[in-house]
């Protein structure tokens, strides 16, 4: 599979707005949700459809097309991933929601799990992991491993900004997984933050410091 950087003008414009130092919590939250919706649109391009006959407004039979049996679970990585959830569900409203809670050790940059709750029948579902920032790739790799351990066979990743280091880690370990990202930035700093990045996405979404 591969990395898909979404080069749509609206996506690039919105990511640019999110980089402003003085952006408000409200605006950052809104833009996160809007870009998540657009990423979900891109990630669902290959969903299969099938014909169905319905009764139209005037009582006549109308042939329409509808999604064909694609079961989806959206998997936000707490806490920042919650900021993308509504945007993805706006596009895929029937998706079930699984949750993974991970905390990063700021000294080692390793991810530690403190919560996980998955929906049933993961082996029949496509999992869309959502997290605004793909930095070192530690949290994403841990989430992928948890999904696989619970039987999930189809996984895709949606994130706003990714660092080359994180992308390299995930694509090397999981070449079968597609990654959809709004922007690929330059590098990580010594603290494991993406540059130029967005700052701490969780703090900006929740208004904490």
From Swiss-Prot:
Uracil binds at residues 194, 199-201. InterPro entries: PRibTrfase_dom, PRTase-like, Upp_B, UPRTase/APRTase, Ura_phspho_trans. SUPFAM superfamilies: PRTase-like. Keywords: Allosteric enzyme, Glycosyltransferase, GTP-binding, Magnesium, Nucleotide-binding, Transferase. It comes from the Bacteria. Its cofactor is Mg(2+). Binds 1 Mg(2+) ion per subunit. The magnesium is bound as Mg-PRPP. Pfam families: UPRTase (PF14681). Its EC number is 2.4.2.9. GO terms for molecular function: GTP binding; magnesium ion binding; uracil phosphoribosyltransferase activity. It is an enzyme of class 2 (transferase). 5-phospho-alpha-D-ribose 1-diphosphate binds at residues 79, 104, 131-139, 200. Allosterically activated by GTP. Pathway: Pyrimidine metabolism; UMP biosynthesis via salvage pathway; UMP from uracil: step 1/1. It catalyses: UMP + diphosphate = 5-phospho-alpha-D-ribose 1-diphosphate + uracil. GO terms for biological process: UMP salvage; uracil salvage. Catalyzes the conversion of uracil and 5-phospho-alpha-D-ribose 1-diphosphate (PRPP) to UMP and diphosphate. Belongs to the UPRTase family. This is Uracil phosphoribosyltransferase. It comes from Citrifermentans bemidjiense (strain ATCC BAA-1014 / DSM 16622 / JCM 12645 / Bem) (Geobacter bemidjiensis). The gene is upp.
